[in-house]
Amino acid sequence: MSYNYVVTAQKPTAVNGCVTAHFTSAEDLNLLIAKNTRLEIYVVTAEGLRPVKEVGMYGKIAVMELFRPKGESKDLLFILTAKYNACILEYKQSGESIDIITRAHGNVQDRIGRPSETGIIGIIDPECRMIGLRLYDGLFKVIPLDRDNKELKAFNIRLEELHVIDVKFLYGCQAPTICFVYQDPQGRHVKTYEVSLREKEFNKGPWKQENVEAEASMVIAVPEPFGGAIIIGQESITYHNGDKYLAIAPPIIKQSTIVCHNRVDPNGSRYLLGDMEGRLFMLLLEKEEQMDGTVTLKDLRVELLGETSIAECLTYLDNGVVFVGSRLGDSQLVKLNVDSNEQGSYVVAMETFTNLGPIVDMCVVDLERQGQGQLVTCSGAFKEGSLRIIRNGIGIHEHASIDLPGIKGLWPLRSDPNRETDDTLVLSFVGQTRVLMLNGEEVEETELMGFVDDQQTFFCGNVAHQQLIQITSASVRLVSQEPKALVSEWKEPQAKNISVASCNSSQVVVAVGRALYYLQIHPQELRQISHTEMEHEVACLDITPLGDSNGLSPLCAIGLWTDISARILKLPSFELLHKEMLGGEIIPRSILMTTFESSHYLLCALGDGALFYFGLNIETGLLSDRKKVTLGTQPTVLRTFRSLSTTNVFACSDRPTVIYSSNHKLVFSNVNLKEVNYMCPLNSDGYPDSLALANNSTLTIGTIDEIQKLHIRTVPLYESPRKICYQEVSQCFGVLSSRIEVQDTSGGTTALRPSASTQALSSSVSSSKLFSSSTAPHETSFGEEVEVHNLLIIDQHTFEVLHAHQFLQNEYALSLVSCKLGKDPNTYFIVGTAMVYPEEAEPKQGRIVVFQYSDGKLQTVAEKEVKGAVYSMVEFNGKLLASINSTVRLYEWTTEKELRTECNHYNNIMALYLKTKGDFILVGDLMRSVLLLAYKPMEGNFEEIARDFNPNWMSAVEILDDDNFLGAENAFNLFVCQKDSAATTDEERQHLQEVGLFHLGEFVNVFCHGSLVMQNLGETSTPTQGSVLFGTVNGMIGLVTSLSESWYNLLLDMQNRLNKVIKSVGKIEHSFWRSFHTERKTEPATGFIDGDLIESFLDISRPKMQEVVANLQYDDGSGMKREATADDLIKVVEELTRIH
């Protein structure tokens, strides 16, 4: 068997539905957003959107409509999922707890019926008498809305018009009346029917209109006083209500297709329209008042307001603010102004909401060489196309920064005796010290009486008896707070320079070369208590008091030069308690005693970024449990700070890290800053609970995130990225992208807008000897859109487009790889293409082009003609493996720098995906699932090992390990196939067994091995093996990892118990939602644990946790089973959350 754990690292971000309503209360205006399986509820306030609740549905939200039945004070929500679960939800709040109550639910799936090509449509009668659903061709399903019915019952009405494009309920009709656009062999028509609840059938409608525009695609029902419906087409907008017919054909809407609409005014006099190019229009209905007081429609008018993200849905909030929900780019809040700006636009973006979808391709790279992967995705499409750089870490939010190069240390001070908060920041430089006064958010340089400013400061701070201390290279200075004056000064007897110092509120230890001096701080006096000589020079020291020692430290920790040791000495006698040889040649640069979760530790950082950490016994001074991690490559400085009332350590280096403890294990979290040399905590009036951070050039004041999370950076391309790969030698990314150009009158094409491929620093164009340009059988006509494909070379640091190489006309770039071939020392970018002509069912020719990028130039090294489309390529044992239409082909690289075919495998329909491991090749087919090949180096050919005989339409594949293969298919499922090496017959051996099945509810475009969290960090006890990330159309990033059988069984037991305790919204069974479901079959999920459900254990109340753990058997690693406690499971689940 295969046991896997699948979990979300980034929830879906693409918006596929949005509505405005009074859902949380009669007064609140709410925005509800659907992001695939997630429903987000916001309140619209004067300051913007305030999140109220996020609900995870056990289903893909296909319909989301609000309605208010008579007698309700606020709106109810109707939701239908893609697996046909329907529910009516209500918002209930009591005190702090918010609940989404399921008022009614049911499944409205039919046993037979062909799901409509135009998808699921759900509508609600304006009088709230019924819900109408168009799920299958030829059927209209009705759910009567009875007040007290807990179960949603539905019945079907036969619909003669099989191909319905869009349908709506009309306003102001005695009986519920639908209006729809349908297509038949003669064209498209509009028709209306009355729905009779009693007879459960249609009656003739009030009007119909035959032969409307051939591209008519949307119906908008207009409220009273107008009534009737607006039909939106590609070129025209028409209004019908039986008596009146009005049509306009504004040229402005022809450029693109209108895909969404939203009513602005309750009386339906204005509508927003959004098209596929991201343009926003206003449709105005002008009224004419008749003599008898009735109102009729006088005219229709369309105005272009401006450009937004490409809208999937629009909803008007209030005061000219519109939410633009996007699937292809970031969603936006925009303001509609009365007057246009210089560009003639009435639209101003107020806020953007990051969307990673659709993730078309991605790669994991460790750009900063930090042992932590960053994910770079090809996201978005058309003008919303971008690269997204995603990394996990703790964010620092910058509040102020000052250009100050050369800072060597910094400390906060409270200059007056009765202050609670810091008001001063002391900065140390080589040979000088500067003092900054903090006044609110203002920062100004000042002088402190009693302080010296012409020497470097090693330590500065508030100490006992209302005094300040400044330790410089020359002396230790004690200064009274009121009045500010030097009251005591200690110098080394021979006036030698102090090299290192450490101080707490009443003790000082300084090192002068090999000598150590211990001083105590008394009122207006520094008293030398003892001194000693070490064998070697002291490199670093620390006397942080631990435990409840009244602020006094009985211990002194030091790190020495020469013998590279860390030692614990007893104060005041400097007696050696423990000596720890660290080994190696790199000296300790920073040492720190600290307490995490009431356990004491000694941390010691070396000059090469390595960190040793030990358990510390504060009674005996003994060190235990020695462990080592690598945090960076530069010397590391350790400083403590407090956040959320726990102690944390900040390790300053070229790779800043926060160290904290969770479940008595140290956790190392990346901080999203390039480098930090020094830091100190700062808590001033203007900057509460902040950190001051210094790098080589700047001082920054900021606040720190409480938890680590994904941070996303956007590099806009303004065109569609398709494929990405990373090339370490040239420190570049290769990206395949395509832009849209329009045929102009001269026969050439022009780009619609500036984008990455037209703005590159340099560019080149393919000229191929293989295809003469005249062979193109297809002539484009004026105004037609053509795709132009490019290879972009993008700098890994600045993400600047260094070079753009344009492929031939009609040539689509499909696959990309960066690799070395054979004995050739060069690394190449290799691109696989196809010549795409509209009249060909599948491409008949394409090419493989080998490029080399060096010294800022891109050269074509070789090209190879192929008979088909090069869908996928991978480097394979120094050769190039490619899939071309139905063939898998291996090329070797000759000394003449040419590609020569070595062998082929033909048994596929369309080989779209290739993954390799050792000599094994996994092939993902368009419709014939996966196939495993082995390459035989001796014979130089492929052998078919086994295949999955289930007809899965593949969207991505990956090799988990030698025997297990992961696949994603087009009905949003994941499955794992296993090679059965132990099988006795050839027949059995040739079958890949499906051992894992799971409904993900997401369309996976790409799998890749890698992780978003720190790797190689010493010890980990997570029970998982390996990590495969995946990216989906909705912008979700997920992770699949393998479990041992015992862990799988524990988590499966836990999952079943959680399902009894956690009530799902809409009363949808978890087992139903996760069951593997295609048009052919439905099977229960197996071999997969739903990590999102497991992790929800951390969010439930303590009593519910107790319910889950009751009588649960748990092996704590000793091999003995015992009853688990809630804390055992919290520990287990927290471990699992760390893998992403």
Curated annotation (Swiss-Prot):
| Subunit-level organization | Component of the UV-DDB complex which includes DDB1 and DDB2; the heterodimer dimerizes to give rise to a heterotetramer when bound to damaged DNA. The UV-DDB complex interacts with monoubiquitinated histone H2A and binds to XPC via the DDB2 subunit. Component of numerous DCX (DDB1-CUL4-X-box) E3 ubiquitin-protein ligase complexes which consist of a core of DDB1, CUL4A or CUL4B and RBX1. DDB1 may recruit specific substrate targeting subunits to the DCX complex.
- Annotated region Interaction with CDT1: the residues are 2-768
Physiological role: Protein, which is both involved in DNA repair and protein ubiquitination, as part of the UV-DDB complex and DCX (DDB1-CUL4-X-box) complexes, respectively. Core component of the UV-DDB complex (UV-damaged DNA-binding protein complex), a complex that recognizes UV-induced DNA damage and recruit proteins of the nucleotide excision repair pathway (the NER pathway) to initiate DNA repair. The UV-DDB complex preferentially binds to cyclobutane pyrimidine dimers (CPD), 6-4 photoproducts (6-4 PP), apurinic sites and short mismatches.
Which pathway does the UniProt entry assign to this protein? Protein modification; protein ubiquitination
Q: List modified residues, type N6-acetyllysine.
A: 1067
Into which family does the record put it? Belongs to the DDB1 family.
On this chain, the residues bearing Phosphothreonine are: 1125
Q: What superkingdom does the record give?
A: Eukaryota
Q: Any idea which UniProt keywords this protein has? A: Acetylation, Cytoplasm, DNA damage, DNA repair, DNA-binding, Isopeptide bond, Nucleus, Phosphoprotein, Repeat, Ubl conjugation, Ubl conjugation pathway
The segment annotated WD repeat beta-propeller C runs over 709-1043
The protein's location, in the record's own words, is: Cytoplasm; Nucleus
- Region feature (WD repeat beta-propeller B): 391-708
Q: Where is this cross-link: Glycyl lysine isopeptide (Lys-Gly) (interchain with G-Cter in SUMO2)?
A: 1121
Q: How is it modified after translation?
A: Phosphorylated by ABL1. Ubiquitinated by CUL4A. Subsequently degraded by ubiquitin-dependent proteolysis.
Q: What is this protein called?
A: DNA damage-binding protein 1
Task: Extract one GO molecular function annotation from the record.
Answer: DNA binding
The free-text domain note is: The core of the protein consists of three WD40 beta-propeller domains.
List of residues that carry N-acetylserine: 2
Mention one GO biological process in which this protein takes part, according to its record: DNA repair
Under InterPro entries, the record lists:
Beta-prop_RSE1/DDB1/CPSF1_1st, Cleavage/polyA-sp_fac_asu_C, RSE1/DDB1/CFT1/CPSF1, WD40/YVTN_repeat-like_dom_sf, WD40_repeat_dom_sf
Interaction with CDT1 and CUL4A, as annotated region = 771-1140
What Gene Ontology terms describe where this protein resides (cellular component)? Cul4-RING E3 ubiquitin ligase complex; Cul4A-RING E3 ubiquitin ligase complex; Cul4B-RING E3 ubiquitin ligase complex; cytoplasm; nucleus
Report if keyword Ubl conjugation is assigned: yes
Pfam family membership, one:
Beta-prop_RSE1_1st
